[in-house]
Amino acid sequence: MSRKPEPQLQAMPLDRSILWNPSMPGVEKSEGTSRSPYPIFFQQEAVIALQEHVKASPTQAIFGFLVGDLFRDPDSGVLYSIIDKTLKLSQTIYGDKTEVVVGRLWDRMQEQLAKAHGTLLGWYHSHPGQGGLLTAHDIETTQKFFTDPWHVTMLVAAEAGGVTGKFFRLSPNDDWHKTPLPFYELLQPESIKADGKKRSFITWRNYKAYGPSLKGPKPKPPEPEPEPPAPPPPPPPPPPKAKEK
């Protein structure tokens, strides 16, 4: 377990995010008020980097680290994490002994982490052809290296319909490795249009957005009521009476 970094004070950016819930039977859906520790915010820049890494090696296992910062909401006191970058392993991984790979790369990763001025928030991995659940090696890797409450394990895959992903977190629950977590997609400023529409980069078929991911246009302001008609002009004065002779 690593030393807990001091969280930065910052309001939870719910208004700039889209909440994604696992679309699996039996998984409780969050409404954005989850009391679970360290809600996950996945910044769109990191989403793009991760998906490009997966698409570049769709049939080979990939590996990388998730980097960002920890924050505390000053009003609610909730601790949360924002993943804003990835440290990808460029070499190809053969087999699935991720514990060995992480152990070999740990010191190099710490050096890159110091250069990035970030906090290690977790790791991601793919194992094509082995299903959408964590393997025994993935579980061992998490239990040995990623035991802090803000750490996450992410399983990704390139499928015919695009990239899919799942977040997991070590917990006392025996089924933690079978229980994907909800997360927030933290939007870039240009992904929020002037009319309130939100553009998502998440195409994962195994997650669904809570509520509409696109907001409709703002309602039109009420049309001004027509001005009352002008009063009719006053009647003309009667003609003067003729003088009697």
Segment roles from a protein language model:
Residues P240-K245:
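Membrane-anchoring helices that localize proteins to membranes
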Residues K218-P239:
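Intrinsically disordered, low-complexity proline-rich regions
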Residues M1-L120, G129-P224:
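Conserved beta-strand-loop surface patch within small alpha/beta domains used
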